[in-house]
Amino acid sequence: MSPTLTVDDLAFEVLPSPRRKTVELTVERDGHLTIRAPEGTDDSVLTAFIQEKRFWLYQKIALKNSMRQAVATKEFVSGEGFPYLGRSYRLLLVDGQDVPLKLEAGRFRMPRAAAGNGREIFIAWYAEHALVWLRNRVRLFASRVGVEPARVEVRDLGFRWGSCGRAGTLNFNWATILLPPAIVEYVVVHELVHLHEDNHTPEFWQRVERALPDYKQRKQWLAEKGAGYVVV
């Protein structure tokens, strides 16, 4: 099994797992292609699977590209709106403030002199608040799912919302805190259930549904609108 696999004009990162029983294709929000497969799967098997899914792959790639193009670039000026837990708050640049960024009275407030580092400041603020919020939600839903994660971490996961580490660590993208609370809860439950099931099997989705009976609507919302929230 090679670490990468190219089939015609499609290049994939191959992610083997000794616990995986099925092959799964993923088109990340940036168009990056991954194929997850049981460890030791022959490249010819993966190639045949990809060829069978070619039409679906091209549809997904086109959709991701159109969603990325629709995202407007943010400017760190007074009046610009920035999302937090599904709501948009306007930025106000101020002349004096003791912290780089704070949300107060319905506005993000940032020292005017710090605007040049606005992206880094916002990401740090989002990551700090995401960790607190996500740890609370993980505690809430872990009992429903029947698992106990080792720890919760927030980091830059690129174009992934979350991941479940082998040691029981749940990793979440700092950008999850931009989404509406109900959608973040779906991301949390999704990763918690991965502590039971590596693969997206029928049993996996049954466990998700037991914790979130309306998960299908949340999942669809995330697929259709989530990319538009990564704006800084």
Q: Where are each of the predicted segments found?
A:
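Active-site-proximal or metal-binding-adjacent scaffold patches in catalytic folds
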Residues: 1-186, 195-232
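Walker B catalytic acidic pair
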Residues: 191
